[in-house]
Amino acid sequence: MFVSSMSSEELCAEAMKDFSILQTKIDLFMDRCGKRYRQEHFIGRFIKRMVVTTKRNNSWTIAFLALNEGFTFLIYAPITGQETCGYIALSSNRNPLVLEYTPHFMQRYRERYLRYYNLETGNYNAFEYFSLKNNNTLYVRQPDNSYYFIS
């Protein structure tokens, strides 16, 4: 289970251990959703989610989110803490990069962006809304081989 007391290295190692288990389920889910999305030519919202619980007791959400012409594919799990919730995500289903969205970041995003502009996220949680609206991100490598991103 991902908890807020884990270090970034521990979170990354745990996520990569789960990835080998998730890979086949991700491929099957993508095939199903992509086929349905192409067949029905949706205009508007198309949301499909699947929750997979691994042997390590991590609940991963695989989400296919489409809004009008654009769509995004997310693989993420919550990082549970005492008060707030962060997320750990995988960047792709082939050669994943583990992305950590800290509880502090998610709390500030809710306070300073969603609440400030009175935005309704609809059926999306804050992480899904952020990922859907900020898909143009620049990943920058740090000297310790970790990344941070600029959106």
PLM region spans:
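Ribonuclease/tRNase effector modules and their secretory precursors
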Residues: M1-S151
